[in-house]
C-alpha cells in the first residue's frame, strides 16, 4: 500500500544528502540494545516497524505494509516468538481514514492484539506524562542511563554538522502479553542491557558457525 507518508519516505531515502532534522521516524535500534531486549523478552521474530535495510527480526512490516492494518497475533502464531517495535513518534496521520502513524494508535493496537494472543515488546521513550503512555501494559522495564539510536543506513550527511550529538533520552521496554506472570515494573542499567546483548550476539555467532540447526 502506498500513501503520502510512504512517498515522502521514498523521496527522502533517495535524496543526495540529508539533515538530522529530516530523520524523523527512521532512527534505528542499536544492535546491543536490540539483542539485550531479545535476551530478556524474546525470541523476537517479527519487527513491526522496519524496512528492508534496518529490520532486526527475520520477518518485518515496512511502512508500505502499515503494521496498523496487519494481524500481528496471527503472524506470531505462525512464527513463534514475540514481536518487536521501535515505533515511529510522528504525529497521527491517516490515509483513507486508516491510521498510518501516531503513538496512541500504535499502543492501542498493541493492546488489542494482546487480547488475541502473543507478546509485543516495544523500546520507547520513558515518557510517562505523554497521552500515549501505555498504562495498561503488562510489564514496563525502565532503563537506567540514557539511550541513543543509530542513523539509518541511507543517511548521507549534508555537511559535518549532521552528526548526532544529543539523541539520547530516558528509555523503557514495554511489554504487552496477557500471559505475563511477573512483576509489573522492573529496572535495568543500560550497561547491563548492553552486556546481555553482547553475550547474546556472541552466542548467535557461535551457533551460526556450527551450521544448520536440526
Task: Say what each PLM segment does.
Residues 1-214:
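Class I S-adenosyl-L-methionine-dependent methyltransferase catalytic core
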